[in-house]
Amino acid sequence: MLGPPRRGPAYKTKLCALWQRGNCNRDTCSFAHGHGDIRRPPSSRGAFTHHPGRRDYRAGDFRGRIDRRFSPRRRHSPGRESRGHRPLYDRRPSSRERDSSYSRSPSRKSERRHEKKTDDGETNSSRSLSLSDNNDEKKKDKFSSGDEKEDHEKQLKQIRLDMEALRDDKTQMEVILDEKIDEVRKISSKVNDLEVQLRREKDECHRMTSKMKKFIKAHARFLKAQEEVKRSQARFERLGDLLASDILKRGANEEGSSVNEDLNERSPNTAATKKRSIPYSTSEEAKAVKKRRERDSDTMTRSDKYRSDVTDFDKTSKGTEATKSLYLKKKLWEDEKSKLGANIFTEKVKGSPVRHVLPSTGMAAHAIDDLNEAIELEDRHESIDALLENDADDKTRSPAIPLQPPPVVQNAYEQYEGDDEEVDVE
């Protein structure tokens, strides 16, 4: 098997495209790596020029040419023959390649004449040299065009691979973009939910702050009201103490004044007693005086007792002023009851006929006076009981209203001033 034909000197007439991109790593590259490596072949008249529209057979592998003799003959193409093209295996030398062609061309004709004049052998040798040069140039052009085609094919393959890789990247990026869009939608929905929740929390916080402010204001008012209640309670306690002391003082003064009036009324009758006809024993008068003194001492001790009870009640109990006033009224009523004794005695005195039978002189008059005083005190106690019941029913009323003092004891002796009779005592 024959090897590839020998190549002539390589002329680098074009720049390497890979070198221009910066990717050419071949040491024996058939293209120029710079303008300095470009070499132009010498111009020759018989050089083969490539015509546009014709098939370029310079590129390709030599194995096809070597084994071409064993391949079947190509069929004739009527279209190509009509255009004036002939197949390679049936190709004959044209008028340009034949000797007659030189005679038809004026330039060749002059050269031929000149060559014929000199030497016929020299003309044949020069013609053979020119043909060999043309063949070498054709081979070089074929080799250079084949290398360029290979380079272009490699570049095309690389571009296709790059395009496929870019398409794969594009699909991956589209998938990633879809995933990111879904994530953005989810995040936007979460953000909307969080915004709604934040608005609700803000509204709830606003309501809670307003409620807290209202509660703080109400608590401050409650504390102020408590302080005012304490101050009013202390003031009411002082007023109750003053009222109780005034009542006790007034009762003591009235009883003392009644005793003095009794003594003053009895003193002008001492002279008239001498004229009385009914004798009285001194022991009975002494008993009456003793009884008056005991009553006076009883009133004094009762006032002291009232004061001690009030102080004890203030110390032991921390109730309201209404309960204190009720307690004081109850004490007054019990003391008055103990002073007068049982109500049975008063009823007996009311039903007894002694009131009309006894004379209005001496001890009988004093007994009637005591009876009237007892009746008046009983009426007064009934009014006190009514007040107690009203206070029990009206506990919710204002405690700042002062208690009404008990009615002043009227002088029981004024109604009997005109009934006194003068009696001559022998």
Swiss-Prot record:
Residues 124-133 have a biased composition (Low complexity). Residues 144-245 form a coiled coil. Residues 416-426 have a biased composition (Acidic residues). Pfam families: zf-CCCH (PF00642). One of its GO terms (molecular function) is zinc ion binding. Residues 34-155, 253-317, 390-426 are annotated as: Disordered. A zinc finger (C3H1-type) spans 10-36. The keyword Coiled coil applies. Keywords: Coiled coil, DNA-binding, Metal-binding, Zinc, Zinc-finger. It comes from the Eukaryota. Residues 255-272 have a biased composition (Polar residues). Residues 54-70, 78-101, 108-120, 135-155, 284-317 have a biased composition (Basic and acidic residues). This is Zinc finger CCCH domain-containing protein 13. It comes from Oryza sativa subsp. japonica.
